[in-house]
Amino acid sequence: MSDSNLDEVLVLIPARMASTRLPGKPLADICGLPMIVQVAMRAKEAAIGRVVVAVDDQQVFDAVSAAGFDVVMTSSDHQSGSDRIFEALTKVDPDGKAKFIVNVQGDLPTIDPQTVRAALRPLENEAVDIGTLTTEIDDEDDKTAPHIVKIVGSPVSDTRLHALYFTRATAPHGKGPLYHHIGLYAYRRAALERFVSLGPSTLERRESLEQLRALEAGMRIDVEIVDTVPLGVDTPADLEKARRILSARTG
């Protein structure tokens, strides 16, 4: 998207305090700042539009606000990040000025701003409802690991796939690259509105993959190919790794 589209793009970052593996995750200190603030900084550095953090806890709200970022309180009852960002969207942009919504997960403090920008590129095609990201799988263990979500897609260019399916299985069969899905999404506003109105689908429940709801409803998802998977912070070990990465960048 060009600079003229900045007013049309809203970057929303959902943050939940209830993490079983890393309690209080949004407020975990990384180089002197809460993790959620580090994520907001990366999103701001992407320079694609307004950045708003969607929270469910007053401590997180206060920390984000103190850092100078826009923040909105949302319900703690949401079952998914998509539901949380939709509530945030209706609160911060009730007039519908934002045409494109980018959902950046709140546990990606080291993400490259260029990776955030890449999620928007598929929406340059008017036929695409949702843009997301992938990278080719190099590690042999990752090719069969159920926690690594794979994309079955048809190439539309050297750097983009048209998603046909997402699965935890090893797919597609046969020779050729396998692709690791990166859960960062860019939606057309109408697509997000439709998505949250649909409710969980059959394949979504079976694979525990929310994006299958869109495919089952006939929505088009295109996938930009990027170089690396951003570090998601889910455990204390991930947190230490994130601290080392950002310390090296700032040191």
Curated annotation (Swiss-Prot):
Molecular function as annotated in GO: 3-deoxy-manno-octulosonate cytidylyltransferase activity
Gene of this entry: kdsB
GO biological process: CMP-keto-3-deoxy-D-manno-octulosonic acid biosynthetic process; lipopolysaccharide biosynthetic process
Pathway listed: Nucleotide-sugar biosynthesis; CMP-3-deoxy-D-manno-octulosonate biosynthesis; CMP-3-deoxy-D-manno-octulosonate from 3-deoxy-D-manno-octulosonate and CTP: step 1/1; Bacterial outer membrane biogenesis; lipopolysaccharide biosynthesis
Stated role: Activates KDO (a required 8-carbon sugar) for incorporation into bacterial lipopolysaccharide in Gram-negative bacteria.
Native source species: Rhizobium etli (strain CIAT 652)
Top-level lineage group: Bacteria
CC annotations in GO: cytosol
Sorted UniProt keywords: Cytoplasm, Lipopolysaccharide biosynthesis, Nucleotidyltransferase, Transferase
Enzyme class: transferase
Signal peptide: none
Enzyme Commission number, as recorded: 2.7.7.38
Record's protein name: 3-deoxy-manno-octulosonate cytidylyltransferase
Compartment(s) where it occurs, according to its Swiss-Prot or TrEMBL record: Cytoplasm
InterPro entries (UniProt xref): Cytidylyl_trans (IPR003329), KdsB (IPR004528), Nucleotide-diphossugar_trans (IPR029044)
